[in-house]
């Protein structure tokens, strides 16, 4: 069973006298920095000049360039997009690290796949809230928190675990529970969830359902509602009560259809495909492809993205969402809270 830590399990004053640099001020960065500050941690922000720099200053932080922040800090938390981290680390972070410092991540991709090779004389650990930045911030303000993962990659000082748990506590994670894992497990499960279920699997399922209905002659607007729009209703039930709770809340007709038709759609062949996806993650194939794609300025990524944005479900969806201003209101509120992307 996974080991879970709560506030009472974590040593006090571990971060006292230590300066934490949050690198990046996007969705996670703004939440970490504000929560750390309000927990009494000495925190600074490192970010490139621009909107994020101005927003961090507006929020009351001491803001520096990435290089300046890394040079001052005892603990450096890297909260940049995966594809930016390696270049920024090499150019602006690495030389500022001193023996006994801590290099911290919220996702293990670059360390696990050896894009970032930390110095041998620093602690390296991971603290990953299991929720977007606006939720990390909002729950903290409410006196609660979002569960988080932590993992130790390199413990030079003998204090890496204490520092990781103290950091997780300071951003509110230990109010809900901090789960112990490894860089390998966090990275591979996170990528698999994104690719096979949450993003890749789900979008492909939605499009296939939409296309099945429209190709059979049904109106695309109805297909959109049935295969995409109403998804939120079901996901919210699953999020709050699990699969059984969702099934309790839907009609018996829908539940019977779930039981008899769901396995026909997601069958053993699909599961075998999922295993292939997992294998590509585990052996580094996916990581290599993504790294190379970024090195050549993303030709496939950009082409696929442009094509997907003009799929019929998007064209229909844009029109239908104009009929539902409440959808956009929720999006605008979240964007204001989250701040800039990086």
From Swiss-Prot:
Co-factor remark: Binds 2 magnesium ions per subunit.
Catalyses which reaction(s): (2R)-2,3-dihydroxy-3-methylbutanoate + NADP(+) = (2S)-2-acetolactate + NADPH + H(+); (2R,3R)-2,3-dihydroxy-3-methylpentanoate + NADP(+) = (S)-2-ethyl-2-hydroxy-3-oxobutanoate + NADPH + H(+)
InterPro entries: 6-PGluconate_DH-like_C_sf (IPR008927), KARI (IPR013023), KARI_C (IPR000506), KARI_N (IPR013116), KARI_prok (IPR014359), NAD(P)-bd_dom_sf (IPR036291)
Domain KARI C-terminal knotted per the UniProt entry, residue ranges: 182-327
Cofactors named for this entry: Mg(2+)
A UniProt-annotated Pfam family: KARI_N
Keyword tags: Amino-acid biosynthesis, Branched-chain amino acid biosynthesis, Magnesium, Metal-binding, NADP, Oxidoreductase
Binding site for substrate: 251
General function of this protein: Involved in the biosynthesis of branched-chain amino acids (BCAA). Catalyzes an alkyl-migration followed by a ketol-acid reduction of (S)-2-acetolactate (S2AL) to yield (R)-2,3-dihydroxy-isovalerate. In the isomerase reaction, S2AL is rearranged via a Mg-dependent methyl migration to produce 3-hydroxy-3-methyl-2-ketobutyrate (HMKB). In the reductase reaction, this 2-ketoacid undergoes a metal-dependent reduction by NADPH to yield (R)-2,3-dihydroxy-isovalerate.
Protein name: Ketol-acid reductoisomerase (NADP(+))
Organism: Bacillus licheniformis (strain ATCC 14580 / DSM 13 / JCM 2505 / CCUG 7422 / NBRC 12200 / NCIMB 9375 / NCTC 10341 / NRRL NRS-1264 / Gibson 46)
Origin organism lineage: Bacteria, Bacillati, Bacillota, Bacilli, Bacillales
